[in-house]
Every structure is written in C-alpha cells, then in structure tokens.
A protein has these predicted regions:
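Alpha-helical residues within the helix-turn-helix
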Residues: 29, 52-53
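N-terminal helix-turn-helix DNA-binding core of bacterial DNA-binding proteins
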Residues: 2-43
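Amphipathic alpha-helical dimerization/coiled-coil segments
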Residues: 81-107
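Beta-hairpin "wing" of winged helix-turn-helix
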Residues: 54-69
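Short, well-ordered turn and helix-capping elements at secondary-structure junctions
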Residues: 31, 35, 61-63, 80
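Basic amphipathic alpha-helical segments that dock to polyanions
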Residues: 44-51
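Exposed loop/turn and edge beta-strand positions of beta-sandwich/beta-sheet ligand-binding modules
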Residues: 72
C-alpha cells in the first residue's frame, strides 16, 4: 500500500476532479474552493514534484500560448499507480470512519 499524506491525498483528488492535463492554477483553485484553505503555489508544486518522483502523477509541458506570454505550462495527470494509491487511501479512510458519526454528535 502506498502511503499518502493528507495534502497529497487532497491534491490527487483535485486531479481526479479536474481531469487529465490540468495545471497548477486550476489545482490550487479547486483545493481552495473545496477545503476553504489558502494554498500556496509552492506547496502545490513541491507536492506534485514529490508525487511525480513516486510515480503517482505524470507531467508534460504543454504548448506555448500568447496568453502566457509564449511560456509553456506544465500539465499533470494521475497515473495508474496514483489511482491505486488513491483507492487504497479512500478505502482506509472509509474503513476508519465507519460507524463514528454518532460519536461526533454534540450532546
């Protein structure tokens, strides 16, 4: 089983939601919108680099565009290994949270 940190888990979930070949800004926007937390670009790119080194995501440079001043953007997608890690993490969380809802109720 591949272990994921909480932020890595959220980042992989954002990649699934956004689909293939997404890049940093939409990933940050998705994370901020769904978690209500501010996320720095540095945190995103550091985590994406780490996930790529582990084979959980793959990146490639897109085509340069006039809107980006001729710069290319790095696009990311989940790998099969990343999907498996996400399924494992989701299963572990589902198993751990099973039956605790009544215990979370305020008296």
């Amino acid at each position: 089983m591949i272990r994921l940190g909480a932020f890595e888990h959220l980042l992989l979930l954002a990649l699934v939601r956004l689909g293939d070949d997404t890049y940093g800004v939409p990933i940050r926007d998705e994370l901020e919108a769904r978690t209500g937390r501010l996320v720095s670009p540095g945190a995103i790119y550091t985590a994406l680099d780490r996930l790529e080194q582990r084979g959980l995501v793959r990146s490639q440079l897109g085509e340069p565009t006039p809107a980006r001043g001729g710069k290319r953007k790095r696009c990311y997608r989940l790998t099969a290994k990343g999907s498996a890690a996400l399924r494992d993490a989701h299963g572990a969380i589902a198993h751990m949270t099973q039956g605790i809802k009544p215990k979370l109720q305020t008296p």
